[in-house]
Each structure stands twice: as structure tokens, then as C-alpha cells.
């Protein structure tokens, strides 16, 4: 039962962090999330699939924010 609770907390933490990535609106905010992730990943054990998912989400959000910055610059 304790293992199930730990698994639940683990999954909730991953889901919460993925939500923060999804709701991030600025490159500065994304850089803070990336720095936090790089620090935290060294302190905890992540499943390979979760690590890949988080890294993909960070990269995807970076591309999205950089593309939106390019569109704003072009409109001036």
C-alpha cells in the first residue's frame, strides 16, 4: 500500500510539472523550469519514459515560444 501511495505522488509530481511546462508563457519562465528540472533530475530517480517526456515537453515549448517571438518581431 505504501508503494502505491509513493507511485501516486510520483505520478502527480510529473503531471504537475508537465502542467507548468504547458502553461508557461515566456522563455524566461521556461528557462527557470529547465534549470529546476536539471537540478532536480540529479536528486531523484526518474523512469526513462518520464525523463524523455519531460525533455520533449521542454523542447516543444521552447520551439513554440521561439516561433511566437519570431511572429511578433515580423509584425513590426
Curated annotation (Swiss-Prot):
Gene3D superfamilies in the record: 1.20.1280.210
Cystine pairs: none
Pfam families according to UniProt: UvsW-1 (PF11637)
Keywords per UniProt: Late protein
InterPro entries in alphabetical order: UvsW.1-like_sf, UvsW.1_dom
Top-rank lineage group of the source organism: Viruses
Biological role: Inhibits the single-stranded annealing activity of UvsW, has no effect on UvsW helicase activity.
Quaternary organization: Probably interacts with UvsW.
Annotated protein name in UniProt: Protein UvsW.1
Lineage, uppermost ranks: Viruses, Duplodnaviria, Heunggongvirae, Uroviricota, Caudoviricetes
